[in-house]
Amino acid sequence: MKTRIKLYAVLTAAALLTGCGAFNSSESTETTTENKTTTAASDTTTDCCEDKENDCCKDEPADCCGDSAEAVTIGAPEKTDINIGHLNSTAHLLAFVAAEEGYFKEEGLNVTLTQFSSAAELVNGIESDKLDVAFVGSVPTLTFQSQGHDISIFGGAMTNGHGYVIKSEYADEDELGVEILKGRNVASVKNSVQDAELQILLKNANIGIGEGKDEVNIVYFDSQKDAYAALSNATIDAASVYSPYASLAKSQGYRVVYYCAHEEALQNQPCCRQIAKTSALNSNPNTFTAIERAFIKAYHFTQTDHDKTIKDVKKYIDIENDLIETEVYGGYSVSSPDPDKQGTVTLKDTIVDLGYTDDYDIESYYNTDIYKNALASIIAEGSDDIYKELEEHFNEYE
């Protein structure tokens, strides 16, 4: 899972863009359990140097003296009824698994999941207090932040998972690249990773955007659902996709133009992020730490039980199991809770350079303490290679 952000020129770095859209609606609730306090390290520290002549704070393990960096005490959630908004993506499985495997309940939370069609709808839900948490694409998140909206990133949801598909009469095999889009009408979503990635690849290939025979004509739609549905129109030849549309398209006879995970210029970009009101993160830290603990546990589950993960995802994204397996475990995307701050800050700088949004100070809109404390508390309860890998990644890319 060690995602490494590769920096190329501004053109390549611009691939660090994101966005997502709509499918079928579903929701899930968890029964509230008794509020509890989770302690990452014992509240009372045993003096392991008692009756010894040596200096325990110099010669013994750090936590012997109660100064371990992992000692984090998490209080009971300030709020237990939580509404989480997601898109129609298999990549948002952290919420699905946390609900179905009872991890929200373990954290004393009563959670309702609701599917939305676009980033704008999700952000509106956050700002109107209809949602407490939302999985939103990085680019729209950054754009809304630059406009002064009170939303902050506190975790991750997906890396990669995008591409384009084309009608089979224009391609006899998959992954022929953007050259086959010349002279075609391509459906996409404005201000999304799909759109930005395509524009980067076209520019790198010296292919213009327009209606000429050697150009690519991009036709914009309000959501990924609408862009994909436009393939049924005779005037649209190709369309953007994100998980699970690529697999769905292949099952319906379309060809994949490219997977972003397979394009060197587009690999490992931070995609959808966990967002919440900045003010809510500040006033209810225990609640969001509990939510993050549930997401981290869900990630661990996805790495250890593939079959049950697929069943959990299917309850929210109702497509065939083999398509879910391809999207989740086929190497096209990664669903990790890590906030991936370095990569997202690089993304912000990139889209500013590209004119997607105005520059702004992202520091006050990025909260990594929630994830840091949640992960530390889980590791203190009992760690393994999966949790250690999350810790290593966070320490390297915070």
Question: Where in this protein do the model-derived segments appear?
Answer:
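Extracellular mucin-like PTS domains
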Residues: E30-T45
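Conserved C-terminal helix/tail region of periplasmic/extracytoplasmic solute-binding proteins
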Residues: V352-E398
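Sec-dependent bacterial lipoprotein signal peptides
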Residues: M1-T18
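Bacterial lipoprotein signal-peptidase II cleavage site
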Residues: G21-T33
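Histidine-centered metal-binding segments
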Residues: S42-S68
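Short, glycine-/small- and polar/acidic-enriched structural segments
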Residues: G66-Y220, D237-S243, V256-C260, Q267-N268, ...
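Pocket-lining segment of extracytoplasmic ligand-binding domains
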Residues: S138-P140, D226-K315
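Secondary-structure end/capping motifs
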Residues: N282-Y360
